[in-house]
Amino acid sequence: MRKKLTLSFLMFLPVVSSYAEQVTTFGIANNNGLRLQESSRLQLIKQDKNNQTTFTDSETFKVTNNNNKIILTGGAQVRRPDAILKGERITYDRLTGEVVSEGNARLIRDGSRVVGEGLKYNVDKKTGEINSPVYRILSGGVGEARFAEIVDENHLRMDDAIYSGCSCDNKLWYIKSPEVNIYDDENEGIAKDGTLYIKGVPVFWSPHLEFTIKKERKTGWLFPTFSMTSRSGFGWNLPFFWNIAPNYDVTLTPSYYSKRGFMLGGEFRYLRPSFSGQLSGTYMPSDSKLHRNRWSINWTHRQKLGEFAGLNFGLTANYSGVSDSDYYRDFSAVAINRAQETFLDKNITLSFGGYNYWSGYLSVQKYQSLHDLTDPDNPIYYYQYERVPELSLKGERYDWGGFDVTTQATVTRFVHPTHEKYYRASWNPNYDFGGHYKADGVRYVSYTQVSYPIIRPGWYITPKIGLHASHYTTDWYTQYTYPNGTPFIRSQAGTQYKNQSRVLPIMSLDTGMTFERKTTLFGKPRTQTLEPRIYYLYIPYRYQSDIPIYDTSVSNFNFGTAFSENRYVGGWDRINDANQVTLGLTSRWLDEDTGKERMAIQVAQKFYFTKPRVFLGGYDYIDTQRVRERYAEKSRSEFLANMSVALTDTLNTEVGAQLDTYDNRLAQTYASLRWFPKNFTSLSLTYRYQREPYLIEGTDQQYSYQLNGKENISIAGQWPVTDKYYLVGRHDYSLYEKRSTQSIIGLEYHDKCCTTARVVFQRYAVSKTKSNSAVFLQVELNGLGGIGSDPLSVLRNSIPGYQNVKTPETVKSPFERYE
């Protein structure tokens, strides 16, 4: 019966994969793939632990005591589903379940193994005792003892024992104790009068020393972490973890910083079938350097609200706040990689979607600005608008008689978070701004698109037409007076209309082809493709300078935006006029055997049939006519070119350029070289240049093509020095500012046994005049935990191709050491 069932199951798999619409007893195939369905023919038979079959094997055997006692000799073994016993001689009593093993006795149970001179074990009661055991448990812990008692299936007690998480012979650390108890179900080991040895030297003693035997959650003190930064000094943290329930836990972390004082941090995580989230925060009652309280709070929440009228409703919330703009810069060790954030998001969103064509959301979004208020390059008008609230409804239907139809309507109330406390503290205390520096208002937007994609082998063509309609209701705060001569809040045109409307048709035609031919590259056969693309766009001109600008900015010109409808992104406050065509050409060289791309060349450029007339300006009225005239002289966009080459399987290079054809000067340049010769080995070189964009707002009306933009070079890598030591580093240098913007240097150690250690130094710019330094030191001991602050997120985000030298732990199987 077993063979027949196994054969039937093996035959079932290819049959179902061959016929996608076939209905079977085991599953139902549909357009979404095969999904399993319950069947009464298949039943899971539970194993009775008290009535298990016993198998024996040996070279010779003898039966005594009315066939109830079996004596096995020569490679003897007794097997049950939950335990295996081996030895040179085994006596097995079938009535009592007692097994006595002599000579190289071994017990293998649930992936753990115990070897001793002799052992007694009851296969029914799961109890026993072993003399001079040497053991290895499933989680990787090893040790030895004078005597061991198997109290039950989850409890092992040992006398005069040694325990270590290092499985190699030369153990870095171990615990020595007159009595060690290991509780597998509680993930806990307890050593009475235990002494911790490192490199054979006793470093810590405790009358009740606890340790975890598996990498699972357990209530207790975690190992302390340490940090060193230039702004906070030496930091010390001692976390306490409280495992409230399998789906709830709390971590409390008292901390001390030598330049700041004491801080208390906490984190609460929760998980339920319909919702989950995390709440964390810190509080410092009095910063000894600034003499004021410092705090932070972060909350994320996701929740399923259920189904109504065929729609699934959900709720998301994100809230982040800090006591001041310098919090993350001062406490970068608390929130690594957040020191350069400029805005903290505070939002709550009610969303819905379902099996029909409609989806939407209602959200409220606010911000906390972390700009350096003393930096002249961060004026108050760089603060973002808040959306309080925003309501959006979207409908999508594809392949509707060959047509793709989408429509979206959004209503947003914009409020600028500029209040008197900002201006009088950071701008000019002599000015009275009436609490407003920018206009507030409501924007109504509707955009419906209809396209008819025609896709055939080797070519496609997609005509599309859309209608955009928007209406603005704006409060320019004309009721306020400005006694100190402050200019009025005005639009780009200098007007202050309360209501503005705009309706624009948008038409485009996107088409492309793909040609292939056989060729060679680097002396090997390749398939070369030639992929021309033409994108025509027409949008009539509408005067828009009297419309406020809430969330719209100029997009970066690249291969993605070259084929887009609007050169402005973020919102719909400006829609460019267009009578233009974008021409693009891509050629690829593909490996014939694997399809891997060995080389690719891309070029693209826009050509304007009519000169652009819509521009993005500021709120203050400025004369941008001269800038506009110079810009309007251009009949084509910048020329885009990019080439990527896989010189070998481990060496890749990429070069990109953006040429301003108006004056034949580079607007942007990018070049990179990346080499990954083997595991834990990488090297990357990068050069970036970006010229300053056109100056179309501000009081200094200069139109310059000087090479004074951003110009940076970066080198990063990970390199093995020996089989145990690895160097990591990165250096970013600004050629324009003539200074380092980031430096990282570190050394990693991994002994392939139980120890991983890292020391990393990082220095990075937090503004044009300020930098921060930090030192990360971490030591990880298998089975004991980690000491120090974790720099892995810094290394992963900063070094392309970085690999953790510590092999990730895999889930252990009970058959890990099956014999």
Question: What name fits each language-model region?
Answer:
Residues 2-19:
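Gram-negative bacterial Sec-dependent N-terminal signal peptides
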Residues 7, 20-21, 233, 245:
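Immediate N-terminus of the mature polypeptide
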Residues 7, 25-26, 808:
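N-terminal compositionally biased, intrinsically disordered segments and leader/signal-like regions
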Residues 10-11, 58-60, 509:
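Short, Lys/Arg-rich amphipathic segments at extreme N-termini
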Residues 18, 63, 816-819:
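Short, intrinsically disordered, low-complexity terminal/loop segments
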Residues 21-160, 174-182, 187-193, 252, ...:
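N-terminal amphipathic/hydrophobic interface segments
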Residues 115-127, 135-157, 161-163, 168-176, ...:
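Outer-membrane beta-barrel proteins and related beta-barrel translocases across Gram-negative bacteria
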